[in-house]
From Swiss-Prot:
UniProt similarity note: Belongs to the universal ribosomal protein uL3 family.
InterPro entries: Ribosomal_uL3 (IPR000597), Ribosomal_uL3_bac/org-type (IPR019927), Ribosomal_uL3_CS (IPR019926), Transl_B-barrel_sf (IPR009000)
NCBIfam families: L3_bact
Region (Disordered) location: 145-172
Complexes and interactors: Part of the 50S ribosomal subunit. Forms a cluster with proteins L14 and L19.
Entry keyword set: Methylation, Ribonucleoprotein, Ribosomal protein, RNA-binding, rRNA-binding
Disulfide bonds: none
N5-methylglutamine modifications at: 168
Designated name of the protein: Large ribosomal subunit protein uL3
Gene Ontology molecular function: any one: rRNA binding
Coiled coil segments of this chain: none
Originating organism: Bordetella petrii (strain ATCC BAA-461 / DSM 12804 / CCUG 43448)
GO cellular component, one term: cytosolic large ribosomal subunit
Function: One of the primary rRNA binding proteins, it binds directly near the 3'-end of the 23S rRNA, where it nucleates assembly of the 50S subunit.
Length: 233
């Protein structure tokens, strides 16, 4: 029978346990007052501990967790031994979360971390994902430049950025100049999203608003590190 770990102890924001999962998609839920709230559904089920890292052995304290599944034929031999040592099946994602060394005794390799033991409704979280790749894009789409005139002397220069530098002096384009290029497919974190609902039975987390990436993309959910202090606290 699988064991469930708890995250009840208060720790600094930088050393709080998070969960790994995937973005299911967006929907909306209604409050008792009839208010419609747009939410993103995150599947953070079956996060299992694969390794405990200690100060003595590794130089820092952390818990390594795995999420998802992977066919045995797709797992490298060293990873196969790593998962076998933890007594758990191979995952598609491995992620470490730094913790207070005093908390390492709470975790056991092979144990499953329940979503309700880490997050609760009303809490704020930071969600990290990979944005949707949009390929090569011009400056209007990539940097929100304004277009040039549609006519009146403008010929074939309607969407070009204009001047990108000077003449012989300095004779180069300065670093950081906003130009056309690849758009999207980068790691981004959205901070301070409200947890609207926690579905413990299915291992789902419903957060208010949008999350980076497409449906099915990998995400990392952590307690908000910049959560505003409560009034009167």
């Amino acid at each position: 029978m699988e064991k469930t770990m708890s995250n009840s102890t208060s720790t600094p924001a930088a050393h709080r346990l998070g969960l790994v999962g995937r973005k299911v998609g967006m929907t909306r839920i209604f409050t008792e007052e009839g208010e419609s709230i747009p939410v993103t559904v995150l599947d953070v089920s079956n996060n299992r501990v694969t390794q405990i890292k200690s100060l003595e052995a590794d130089g820092y304290a952390a818990v390594q967790v795995a999420y998802g599944t992977r066919r045995a034929s797709r797992v490298a031999q060293p990873q196969t031994g790593h998962y076998a040592k933890a007594g758990t099946e191979a995952g598609s994602i491995l992620k470490e979360f730094r913790l207070d060394p005093a908390r390492l005794a709470e975790f056991t390799p092979g144990a499953v971390i329940a979503v309700e033991s880490v997050f609760e409704a009303g809490q704020q979280v930071d969600v990290t994902g990979t944005t949707i790749g949009k390929g090569f894009a011009g400056t209007i789409k990539r940097h929100h430049f304004g277009s040039q005139r549609a006519s009146h002397g403008n010929s074939r220069s309607h969407r070009v950025p204009g001047s990108i530098g000077q003449a012989q002096d300095p004779g180069r384009i300065f670093p950081g100049k906003r130009m056309s290029g690849h758009l999207g497919d980068v790691t981004r974190t959205v901070q301070n999203l409200d947890v609207v609902r926690v579905d413990a039975e299915r291992g789902l987390l419903l957060v208010k608003g949008a999350v980076p990436g497409h449906a099915g993309g990998d995400v990392v959910v952590r307690p908000a590190i910049k959560a505003p202090a409560k009034k009167g606290a």
